[in-house]
Design a protein with these regions (language model features):
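Glycine-rich phosphate/diphosphate-binding loops that line cofactor/substrate pockets in enzymes
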Residues: 57, 173-182
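Flexible loop/turn connectors
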Residues: 230-336
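Alpha-helical recognition/docking segments in bacterial nutrient-uptake
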Residues: 58-172, 235-236, 240, 251
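Residue-level detector of anion-binding/catalytic polar loops
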Residues: 95, 143, 180, 211, ...
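N-terminal helix-turn-helix DNA-binding module of bacterial transcription factors
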Residues: 1-56
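Hinge/beta->alpha junction and helix N-cap segments in small-molecule ligand-binding domains
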Residues: 65-80, 98-105, 159-169, 185-232, ...
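Periplasmic-binding protein-like
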Residues: 119-125, 183-186, 217, 239-249, ...
Length: 336
């Protein structure tokens, strides 16, 4: 039976995208991790999978910017985005360099390492960024695409999720199922994506002749454990609950659902929940979570395509590319 990338990843506790980068002799992975993978292949009798000498390709650089780490973390969402970037980069004949930048330390100092290896273009994972955070990167004077965030007054190409469309579709589904008392499980960590989803929720509610009462707005930490603990504290105050909740992402939905179940509520009989992103935890939830699907790999692939267009000077204008979403109906929403 052939050895698969995910098998090696599981054995070593690394992501499949890391193994893929190493097997394809791509840069951006530490030598220690690279050697661990080579050692495991040799141990299992698959030394033939160890790549030969590196081919000299031009470089693209992916910068994963963590301002606080409250949202950007080692989740399926971001691993899929990175996999899309890697796939399209290789397909286009480039190497991929990967750097992590911490917003907690002086960014200018962290950018010095960029001068140690040349790159033709930069993809900036800007999920946790504000417009001010972009300034040091603009001084690099290289083609750049901002991924997963858009800043209206910054002249920069961007590839983003159509968050308002997705949130509006979620609310529309709830209203079509008869819900009029709809609550919102909103992240207590600010990022542009969540703010746009909030705008979509409010717009869709108004379009249906409904409002979002302050008492139905629950502020939760955007992780499974964080949302669970936040929801437990809120439920201990015995609030009046809506008949349905929209959550900023699947992690919040799953954590909140766990707290609701422990408090004696049955989903969806007592309360319906709908998430956003369509991560594996959504399908694994009991009952499986209705959610909004985001084409994660496509986000990454489009960012690479747009960056290469810049490098090749195919277009001069700045472009915002919005990637559409769609509803995935499972079993966490019922008609009332």
């Amino acid at each position: 039976m052939a050895l698969k990338v995910k098998d090696i990843a599981n054995m070593l506790g690394v992501s499949p995208s890391t193994v893929s980068l190493v097997l394809n002799n791509r840069p951006g992975i530490s030598e220690s991790t690279r050697q661990r993978i080579f050692d495991k292949l040799t141990e299992l009798g698959y030394s033939n999978m160890i790549p030969k000498a590196t081919t000299n390709y031009p470089n693209l650089r992916l910068v994963i910017y963590k301002k606080h780490g409250g949202v950007v973390s080692d989740t399926h969402f971001f691993s899929q985005v990175i996999e899309g970037i890697d796939t399209q980069t290789r397909k286009s004949g480039y190497n991929l360099l990967i750097n992590y930048i911490s917003g907690l330390d002086p960014v200018e100092e962290q950018l010095r390492c960029f001068n140690q290896s040349s790159c033709d273009g930069l993809i900036l994972l800007a999920t946790e960024m504000s417009p001010e955070d972009l300034t040091p990167f603009q001084t690099l004077k290289i083609p750049t695409v901002v991924l997963d965030s858009y800043f209206q007054f910054v002249q920069q190409d961007a590839v983003v999720i159509n968050n308002m469309q997705g949130a509006s579709e979620a609310i529309r589904h709830l209203t079509e199922m008869g819900h009029t008392r709809i609550g919102y499980l909103h992240s207590n960590v600010y990022i542009n994506n969540f703010q746009e989803r909030r705008d979509g929720v409010i717009q869709a509610l108004r379009g249906a002749g409904l409002q979002l009462p302050e008492s139905f707005l629950f502020s939760l930490t955007p992780s499974i454990d964080g949302a669970y603990n936040s929801m437990r504290r809120l439920l201990s105050q015995q609030p009046v609950l809506p008949t349905a909740f929209f959550a900023d992402n699947d992690l919040i939905a799953v954590g909140a659902a766990r707290a609701l179940r422990e408090a004696g509520y049955v989903i969806p009989n007592d309360i319906s929940i709908i998430g956003f992103d369509d991560m594996p935890v959504a399908e694994a939830m009991n009952p499986p979570l209705t959610t909004i699907y985001v084409p994660k790999q496509r986000l990454g692939m489009l960012a690479v395509k747009r960056l290469i267009s810049q490098i090749q000077q195919e277009t001069a204008e700045f472009v915002k590319i919005e990637v559409g979403t769609h509803l995935v109906c499972r079993q966490s929403v019922r008609a009332v």
